[in-house]
Amino acid sequence: MGAGAQEPNVHKEAATAELTIRQGADGSFSLWSPRFGEGFHSRRGALREARETFLAPSQLERFSPGQRLTVVEVCVGTGTNLALLLEGCAELGLELEWWGLELDPAPLQLALAETGFRSQWQSQTLATLETLSERGCWQQGSGQQSSGQQSCGQQGAGSGRMLWGDARQTLPHLLEQRRGQVDLIWHDAFSPQHCPQLWTAEFLGSLADLLADGGHWISYCSAAAVREGLRLANLNVAALATPNPGPSSGQQQPSWSGGTVASHQHLATSVLWRPLSSMELEHMSCSAGEPYRDPTATANAADILHQRRIAQAKALSLGERRTSSAWRKRWGLQQGC
């Protein structure tokens, strides 16, 4: 999971030193961040999560060979999702236009320095990731210079560009260029409890503005507040199928849901996702469904969480929302769901 927006003036050297290498149940490379108290991937493993949560629901096969596929990845982290996407597009003959929103270059650098990570990918995939890490972009063909940036390397099919920095500040730049044109958004930030900056109703609304009519927003996250934020952005929301078998994720992925998919269009039931259940809809209407807010796109995590607690208390006092404990009791769920 890519590092999301952090507090101002954080020394990246210190953050890098904190990252530790982990291995998931599938044996794939991953990292752990003590700062956020979370792994970059679920306990299932990075490769399995990338395939089941992001690649499979994207249904790349619905795009024709030679067609351009525009993808935005929120928090790139180790580059595992991107690597799998690169190889999937190459296999299907798709021209990938990729945009990454990422604060910290360290996770990708650490991954590329590890044999365990490199052994997972084809040489062309590694060359593209290396070019992205070194130059912040890749470009098929001439390696032409773009927007005053340094020349992009001639690696991989299509093109890719990393927008470094706080995603809340770089997203407007992307909106200027790709509003209503994005086929897929892969949202892989740290969980809302630890990185609420990238799960606010305002941020989700801007991402929704990027989506093409048939575009899909996809994430591991099943949080009621996030789903409510997507609903407020006028997106149709469905639940991803629960991965089975395998241990549950440590990334806010309850046993009854494998994540969330959202779109401007109706999401017909499939083997990959289903309509939200009555239990999940009630979850959105209780205290847990109070969305995260950041109207200035500058608030830190503590302030966002504090303001949400105030909003939750107000909604409860006015009878606008039920308590989450009452919801859990009604559905026989354990604390923390």
Model-based region annotation:
Residues 4, 10-69, 78-92, 109-112:
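Class I SAM-dependent methyltransferase Rossmann-like catalytic core
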Residues 17-22, 260-337:
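SAM/dcSAM-binding transferase cores
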Residues 60-143, 150-180, 186, 306, ...:
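The AdoMet/dcAdoMet-binding core of the Class I SAM-like
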Residues 183-198:
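A short SAM/SAH-binding and catalytic strip from SAM-dependent methyltransferases
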Residues 184-186, 213-221:
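Conserved beta-strand signature within the Rossmann-like core of class I S-adenosyl-L-methionine
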Residues 197-214:
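A short glycine-rich, Lys/Arg-flanked "PGG" loop and its adjoining helix->strand segment in the class I
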Residues 227-258:
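Conserved Class I S-adenosyl-L-methionine
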